[in-house]
Amino acid sequence: MNRIIVVTSGKGGVGKTTTTANLGAALARLGKKVVLIDADFGLRNLDLLLGLEQRIVYTAIDVLADECTIDKALVKDKRLPNLVLLPAAQNRSKDAINAEQMQSLVEQLKDKFDYIIIDCPAGIEAGFRNAVAPAQEAIIVTTPEMSAVRDADRVIGLLEAEDIGKISLIVNRLRPEMVQLNQMISVEDILDLLAVPLIGILPDDQKIIISTNKGEPLVMEEKLSVPGLAFQNIARRLEGQDIPFLDFMAAHNTLLNRIRRRLLGG
């Protein structure tokens, strides 16, 4: 049975599209057939993060206009045979497609893939409603900032109103040193505020920026970095595996203790 998941946030710039790209690649590496749908019409970026921007010929709009079949619009990733992208049109606004059309696209794909992952545009307007319409599950991406958490709370309420059966949370850009200084909200406090299950924690790491600029998802590295491992673990949890969370706070404390010992000559 396939799964249709929308990745959303409410607030822009929290790492939603980066999450979509890495989860798709990680699931493909686990042997799952995955299609990523870029639902951010007019502002598509998913193709860039996957390094597929030069291979786009048709988009979802062309499929809906009967200018091509959906198979022709799918962009294959030569590095990962199980991963394909259905790109958004870059020259259209977010209202270029409606909820029924989004459901039609998903209907054409659902018998061919194990996972259909929809990259939702930021905000809670028409683009959000369209992306959410065919989804069975949702992953909320937030950062440890009050504005992002408040927006995530609003989105959770909207998802529940749409009868989305399963909602999970990813906390991105965690900085343990700021949490310890009470300059950043802790993961525990975010969970208390949002009251949805946690599926992943990602550190604030420059490797994520480097990978997005290169168009190479972190999970495709031969030797996984810490954020790459965190993304891989999220994919494995989606598959039902019981994977412990990386303890970034403990790792930070261990580093501090090492520095103190060196300074004190211990």
From Swiss-Prot:
Presence of keyword Protease: no
Any GO BP annotation: cytokinesis, division site positioning
A Pfam family assignment: AAA_31
UniProt keywords, alphabetically: ATP-binding, Cell cycle, Cell division, Cell membrane, Membrane, Nucleotide-binding, Septation
SUPFAM superfamilies hit by this protein: P-loop containing nucleoside triphosphate hydrolases
Gene3D superfamilies in the cross-refs: P-loop containing nucleotide triphosphate hydrolases (3.40.50.300)
Superkingdom of origin: Bacteria
A single MF term (Gene Ontology): ATP hydrolysis activity
Compartments where located: Cell membrane
Positions bound to ATP: K11, G12, G13, V14, G15, K16, T17, T18
Signal peptide: none
GO cellular component: cytoplasmic side of plasma membrane; cytosol
Membrane topology: Peripheral membrane protein
The family this protein is said to belong to: Belongs to the ParA family. MinD subfamily.
Function of the protein: ATPase required for the correct placement of the division site. Cell division inhibitors MinC and MinD act in concert to form an inhibitor capable of blocking formation of the polar Z ring septums. Rapidly oscillates between the poles of the cell to destabilize FtsZ filaments that have formed before they mature into polar Z rings.
SUBUNIT field: Interacts with MinC and FtsZ.
Name of this chain's protein: Septum site-determining protein MinD
Lineage: Bacteria, Bacillati, Cyanobacteriota, Cyanophyceae, Synechococcales
Gene: minD
